[in-house]
Structure formats: C-alpha cells, structure tokens
Amino acid sequence: MAIILTNLYRTVAAGIVLALVLLAAVIVLGEVDIGSAFGGRITWAYLFVWIHVASGVMWIGLLYYFNFVQMIQMPKIPAEQKPAVSKFIAPEVLWWFRWAAMSTIVTGLIVAWLRGYLHDAYMLGFADGFDVPTFFIGVGMWLGTIMWFNVWFVIWPNQKKALNINNAYPDLPQAQKDRAARLAMLFSRTNMMLSIPLLLAMTGGGLNYGNSGL
C-alpha cells in the first residue's frame, strides 16, 4: 500500500481503479445491460458529471485554500520566508486552480448540452414558461461562468504580475505589483462570496433534475 500512497499519481490511479470497480459492481449486481450502460447520451452525461464534480471540488477547494489559509497567513510569515510561498507554492496552486476552473466550466456545459437544458438554463427557466429546477441550475451556471471569467481574465493575469510568475514581469514597479495583488485578492474574495449561492444552486438544481429522470 505504501508504494501507492507515497506517489501522488499512483494514488490517483488507484482511486480511478476503485471507482471503476464500484461501477462494475453496480452493473453486475443491478443486472444492467452492458450495451445500454455504455451507450447513449445518459452514460456520457454521467461520465462528464463525474469529471465536472471532481474538477469543481478541486477548483472550489483551492479557492477556499487561498481565502481561508494563504491570504490570512501570508502577513504573519517573516519576509525572508515568504518566497517559499510566492515562488514555489503559489504558482503551482494557481496552475491547478485555473485549469480546474476551465475543466469545471467546459464539462458543465457539455453535461448541460447532453442533458438538453443548456439553452433553457442560461435563459433561467424562462424559455418556455418559468421552471424552478431550470432556474436553480441556470443561476448556478451563470455564477460559475462569472467565476471562471474572474479566474482567467482577472485573478490569473494579476497574480502573474504580482508574483512575477515565469519571470514575465521582471521590471514591473512594486506599486504596480501591489495593485495587481490587491485586484487579484478582491476578485478572489468575490468568487468566494459567489461560491456560496453557487453551491446552493448547483446542488438544488441537480437534485431536481435527478428526480425528473433526465
């Protein structure tokens, strides 16, 4: 077991294997026809839901790490120790953070398209008369889209400046770095705020859609 758990990638691979074993058990014990189980839109939607949820957990988890841990603790770290965070930890976290956001939004749109509610959800359930589940999931989709935009077009570009990631801004004045850091912080806090109604909307909307048999 140690040979698996001491390596991140082997640990992830083991988790995927366990998930596939669980799926196989459901197919066998539930006497599910394999042909129907691995064909059609519903199966593809389920696969992308799985990826969507995993990506979302990483995205929101790292968002909460930034807001609940790093932002609060950075002022307490001695100046000579801060480069350990700003030069090594933060750039790596930001890589996973922004690509988890991208994976979440892309797979979410694919799921909405496969399950047939992409247009109606972005119309907030008003396309053919008001529909509560579609409104719920639509609010979540709009909030997620706004948060994704903030990550890619505000937080990430400004963090690159503030931390001089990949030495992209070696001559940027400190005043501009400070402004970039503050802007990134404010939009990270904005995403933190939006994530709370987002999670309510997504879980509520998902339960409604699950009950409708879509």
Regions found by a protein language model. Name each.
Residues M1-L214:
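Polytopic transmembrane helical bundles with strong interfacial aromatic enrichment
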